[in-house]
């Protein structure tokens, strides 16, 4: 959600069926409106509790020229959080960044027969041109090192990136 925003920010319009059977549409062509509540964001944020979404209009992003993923472990959650804070404060346009604590890593190791170091981990993904991805990743790697982060485990190939993110999704 760092670079592209949350799902709520990427849904432009909806068709919703309410519990009583009424159907209504939200959203429109204008980006801003002062005409009351933003029902699109309200419905998306409710995750299905206010109505059944039958159609939606999404904001689409182009496929980046280059994508790289990395995993980095830290001795403490605070070290990982400080890395996240500094990365965001520096304005680095990171595509994805997620923190997984040591208890979750331990559970993933046991359940999925993995052998990750039992410590907090940051899962990162960088999008852009080859040069910008390289620059972003080097900068974040330096920041992580300043907060006792391990060397990044990298991948630019789709299959390997998916493998790196597997433990995060398994959590």
Language-model-detected regions and their locations in the chain:
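FAD-binding subdomain of flavoenzyme oxidoreductases
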Residues: 1-98
């Amino acid at each position: 959600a760092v670079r592209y925003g949350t799902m709520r920010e990427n849904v432009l319009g909806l068709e919703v069926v309410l519990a009583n059977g009424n159907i209504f549409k939200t959203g429109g062509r204008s980006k801003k409106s002062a005409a009351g509540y933003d029902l699109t964001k309200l419905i998306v944020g409710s995750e299905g509790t206010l109505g059944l979404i039958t159609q939606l209009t999404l904001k689409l992003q182009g496929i980046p020229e280059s994508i790289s993923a990395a995993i980095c472990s830290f001795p403490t959650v605070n070290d990982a959080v400080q890395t996240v804070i500094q990365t965001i404060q520096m304005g680095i346009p990171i595509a994805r960044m997620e923190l997984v604590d040591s208890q979750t890593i331990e559970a993933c190791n046991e359940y999925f027969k993995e052998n990750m170091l039992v410590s907090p981990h940051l899962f990162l993904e960088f999008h852009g041109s080859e040069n910008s991805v390289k620059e972003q990743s080097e900068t974040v790697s330096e920041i992580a090192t300043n907060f006792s982060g391990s060397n990044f485990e990298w991948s630019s190939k789709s299959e390997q990136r998916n493998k790196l993110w597997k433990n995060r999704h398994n959590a």
